[in-house]
Amino acid sequence: MLSEESIPVIIGTGLIGMAISRTLSAKNIKHFAIGSPPNPNTPKLGESMNGEGSMDLQQLFPEFRQYYFPKKNIIFYTGKLVTQCHLDLTTNKAFAAFFYLTGYNVFENLFHVDRLGFDVALFDSITKNENCIFIDGRVTDVIYDRDGDKIEEIVLSDGSKLHPSFVFDATNHVRLLPKKLNIPCNFLSEKQRTVFTHYRHPDYKLGPSDNKAQKESWSHSTSLLKLSQELDGIEGMAWCIPLGDYVSVGTSINAQKNEGVTSKEQIMELLDRAYQKRGIDYRKYYSQETEIVSIENQYFIHERAGGANWLLAAGTYSQVWFPSGSGVAIALYTARFADRWLKSPKKANKQYEKFIRRFLPSHGIHDQIISSNLKDLTYRQMYQLTDSLLTNSLSIMCTYAQSRNSSLGALIATLIKSLMELKLLKISYFCKILESEMENQTKDIYTEGLKYL
């Protein structure tokens, strides 16, 4: 028995668990955090932030800003079409005005995050706090009172037992509690195979660094690429995220439709060539190879997010298509309000489920783009899809503003959301789309003055 004291327990010390620990410690709430230290050599997911994630990173973790890089654009490569969504708040005044009116702190950019350096620094910070009791281990069993919907006991791999006052399951795709408690799960996709890696600059070192590809137009963009069998030898959706001394590159492919491509090395070779064809030659700057990670996953949402004394935190409750940039944002939302579950779990669960379900429309839109036939995808459809994505993103941020910002900001957010839902306020042609030869697409999309469709 580690402790007779009944205190909160966090299972998992990835970003979700660490962020929750940080909040509990700030509230002087003693707790256990069970997991393992982050491995600074293993590539991670969740490096491209959406709006709310970027704001929360800046506000909750200001001391780690050396790991944040400006994200000024999202670029979609979809066959002959290339789409630019401009996110620089220093030049996009309408976007900046939205944040200001709804009560968010003023900030200039969305972010890419160096998760290797950030996670190591955050882990060091939380485990040094006297309110966090870190246990390097894993949970092997839980004793669950089904009638009371409460977790009574947690059993660790060394046989130790804890009697928690509350449990935050931050195990992400492992989904420890859902499997132990038999929580019904609705899968939102077929089985996916996600393959990703980091390519490093020869001078790479763990810690803050400047952007080694800074002179390239794509160095401050999340570049998303719809891969096709005809053009690239593989079907899926890929990403390229520059992060100072290294670049994060990967893809999510349908496991069944790409059965002929079995080697993770082969997948990365196809991916490297696909980006080079579009004018993004990241290997020119980042020549050093690292571990290639290959995992099978499905996107999902559980029937419920929590019970009387437990919560499926962030990615343990639901995961949607990665281009939404929502994974870390939901983790930080969970962390910001972590103490609310200790006071009123039923109310907190209801608000939480309502908020996270607002990401489902974005998942559906990304699914349309990813499953579409590139030959049939028109620029009008891309405008409709990207405008719908932005509309849903702004609606999510309005919902978030209602729970975290000033009363005036929350009121304006409620009004804006209502106008969008009534279709009295519409987002039209926010992104820019052009048709271009594949080898010229990257050059053309960043060239001012070209005629857009």
How should each PLM-predicted stretch be described?
Residues 11-13, 23-47:
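Glycine-rich FAD pyrophosphate-binding loop
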Residues 16, 39, 174:
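Conserved Rossmann-like nucleotide-cofactor binding loop
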Residues 37-90:
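N-terminal FAD cofactor-binding segment of flavoenzymes
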Residues 96-124, 176, 258-264:
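Short beta-strand to alpha-helix junction loop
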Residues 161, 236, 255-341, 346-347:
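FAD/FMN-dependent oxidoreductases across multiple families
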Residues 340-453:
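C-terminal helical "tail/cap" subdomain of flavin- and related membrane-associated enzymes
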Residues 2-16:
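Beta1/beta-strand and adjacent pyrophosphate-binding region of the FAD-binding site
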